[in-house]
Amino acid sequence: MNSKSNTQTCLPPPSTDLACNSTDAKESKAAIPPMLQVLLLEDNVELAELLRLMFEMWGFQPTVAHLGREASRLLEEQEFRLALVDIDLPDTTGFEVVAGALARGWLRNTKIIFFSGDPSDDRVAMARQFPGSIFVPKPFEMKNLMGLIQKLFPNEPTCEC
């Protein structure tokens, strides 16, 4: 999305006065929309950290899980608007995590992006069994991922870094 009206910059313009009194801080907090809660389920620690940093830079609030059981616990405790789910995990599959969460009534208002280094037809077909989910093959470009997320959440302010 190239519209500047729906975006926020990562850094304030050089002319911005960063000093504010408590009244200004209260007013500015009221104007800032809540951050998009994102679950990142990825067993590769380096990729998970990169995704976490990118999502923070984009203005989202990511929570990372490296195992399916960690993700299930997080899904029970809090709501997410977006879940990026690796399919191949050491303790289960991303499909099983999502199916279990949906069976418990979790993830009802969550957009799901499955990703895997194995983009076989079987994997894509399995991902399509979850209504509204998207399959993204690894490796992927971060800018393409951001573009996809902007399409999923057109009204969310995002960072164009």
Task: Kindly give the residue locations of the regions a language model identified.
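Non-catalytic signal-transmission and effector/linker regions of two-component phosphorelay proteins
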Residues: 1-39, 141-161
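Acidic, metal-coordinating helix/loop segments flanking the phosphotransfer/catalytic sites
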Residues: 64-82
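Short amphipathic alpha-helix used as the core "switch/output" element in two-component signaling
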Residues: 95-108
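Alpha4 helix (beta4-alpha4-beta5 surface) of REC/receiver domains from two-component response regulators
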Residues: 95-96, 118-137, 143, 147
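Two-component/phosphorelay signaling modules centered on CheY-like receiver
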Residues: 45-63, 130-133
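Acidic catalytic/metal-coordinating carboxylates
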Residues: 67, 93-96
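Conserved acidic carboxylate
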Residues: 42
